[in-house]
Amino acid sequence: MNDITYITYQTFPAHTANSLQTISVIKYLARNNKKVKLIFPDRSSLSNDDINELQNFYGFNETFEVTKTHHNYPFRDYLGDSNFKKVRFHISHFLWSKKVVKKVLQENNTKTYFTRSDWVFYFLNRNNQKVIYECHQVSKLRKF
């Protein structure tokens, strides 16, 4: 298990617990000589895939490949009051996950994937891929 692709529906850099946890996991995988690639969507104007920026923001020295993917769905940055905020988020998450998994499987020969995303896990699993799925709590979607 030397090559690991970590696909997540988060944005980086960010002060959220999820983003901090993801970087921590990747940092320790890299410390243990694993070749890691992080893939995430460009959902925010603050999103950045420059490893030097991430190292400065999170305070680590390890290196790994970082790819910010295009996020062209109309569910980006939920400013203002929206009655459909959660629904829009899930639709966007579903569509992005389906697209990114298809793309990664076409151009990547990774043997192991790591994710916190329900939809990324679903699409990788449907394609018989080896997936490490990190889950911290049961959600309504996961119960479904």
Regions found by a protein language model. Name each.
Residues R43-S44, S117-F121:
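Short, polar loop motifs at secondary-structure junctions
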Residues V25, H90, K140-L141:
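Alpha-helical and His/Cys-centered functional microenvironments
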